[in-house]
Amino acid sequence: MLTKPSALSRLVGELKKLPGVGERTALRLAFHLLKTPQNLTALSESLLEVKSRVRSCSICFAITEDDPCAICAGDRDTGTICVVENSQDLMALERSNAYHGTYHVLEGVISPLAGIGPSELRIAELLARIGRGGVDEVVIATNFTVEGEATALYLAKLLKPLGIRISRLAHGIPLGSDIEYVDAATVQWALQGRNQL
């Protein structure tokens, strides 16, 4: 019986760690890469480049190659901070061209079942940013999932005593969906129709 070479097995194992990639898909991808050595080389170089150049912005925690990121270093409205779960959600909001403030990436949501509490998120850093002054509004743009809603309510309760406006994206984004997958027009409508909490 023919067995997979150990290097191929390792590649398949690493590919399976990607979201939505099972054994068969990983094997198909591995064989495709083997058939096109130039793609394999380009992919490995790209992975090494991402590892060495991409980091989190020290202000908003979005992924970036420059620190601070282009949004934090630019001339955006610093009086408004949009709080998102991750950098993918930030990019989805940016595609709408409807928001012109700054961002704060939590790097997750409160999820007791997964053992993630508020202290595992970038909430302390958000409070420190607000504490430095100049922030008039925080737009909570967590996803409309159970965890996203719990995180939004936690943030609203935490921020209310600070005397700043707290708003939530309007529910034009379907419940249970991730902002990352919503079209730009819907995101724009949701930003414009956001509600105060």
Curated annotation (Swiss-Prot):
Q: Does the keyword DNA repair apply?
A: yes
Taking every annotated instance into account, which residue ranges of this chain make up the domain Toprim? 79-174
- Entries under Pfam families matching the protein: RecR_C, RecR_HhH, RecR_ZnF, Toprim_4
The GO biological-process annotations, alphabetized, read as: DNA recombination; DNA repair
Keywords assigned: DNA damage, DNA recombination, DNA repair, Metal-binding, Zinc, Zinc-finger
Q: Does the keyword Transcription regulation apply?
A: no
* CDD domains registered for this protein in UniProt: TOPRIM_recR
Molecular function (GO) terms for this protein are: DNA binding; zinc ion binding
Q: What function does this protein fulfil?
A: May play a role in DNA repair. It seems to be involved in an RecBC-independent recombinational process of DNA repair. It may act with RecF and RecO.
> HAMAP family this protein is in?
RecR
Which PANTHER family does the record match to this protein? RECOMBINATION PROTEIN RECR
Assigned protein family: Belongs to the RecR family.
Q: What is this protein called?
A: Recombination protein RecR
> What's the source species for this entry?
Pelobacter propionicus (strain DSM 2379 / NBRC 103807 / OttBd1)
